[in-house]
């Protein structure tokens, strides 16, 4: 067991370039809401920062030497850009800024918990088998679906599917032939990450998400095993995290 002497805390690094995103995030209060959830849920042996910062590239990171998660303003800006185009292509003029904001927050939600997956593996010295990047995607799924933001099942499922489409769009940004570097990367291919997230969402609730199969987004050959896959993720994380959860 560990001593619970630490807390998650949030910092916004001031930004000139991405001021509108900094202001928007502070208005939405998404990150502000995650801090008490995390501190109520998890014991920490030391403080861990969640920082919103300029990084020079659209990405997010966990730094094990600094015990810090960084979500980049560039990542939020790029997600905003991608989903503006996505909503245009799917809905034409009939989408609202609320639709866009909801979807961007959805993607931020999985991204934050993906990075926190890396953080918990490091902080709690959790054993993993398989690529840690896949395990972090599974942790994101576990939190979004089992502990949905705002106690709303639908949010978690929407966040999973929005993030899946984000991976698909990332794949389409580089449609050329795969390089050895792509296959050697520590992440699964973006297309694979799309199908994984779709599968686990379907596995969480096949009835609500049957459209994924009906619309051809998730092949039936994969869908057949998704309930089992998702159950395995939940039981695995339940076991791994048990020693580190706050007592009720």
For each predicted feature, which ranges?
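Active-site recognition of the HExxH zinc-binding catalytic motif
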Residues: 71, 106, 110-125, 133-141
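Catalytic zinc-binding patch centered on the HExxH motif and its immediate surroundings
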Residues: 52-70, 75-85
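Short pre-active-site segment immediately N-terminal to the catalytic Zn-binding motif
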Residues: 82-85, 89-111, 124-130
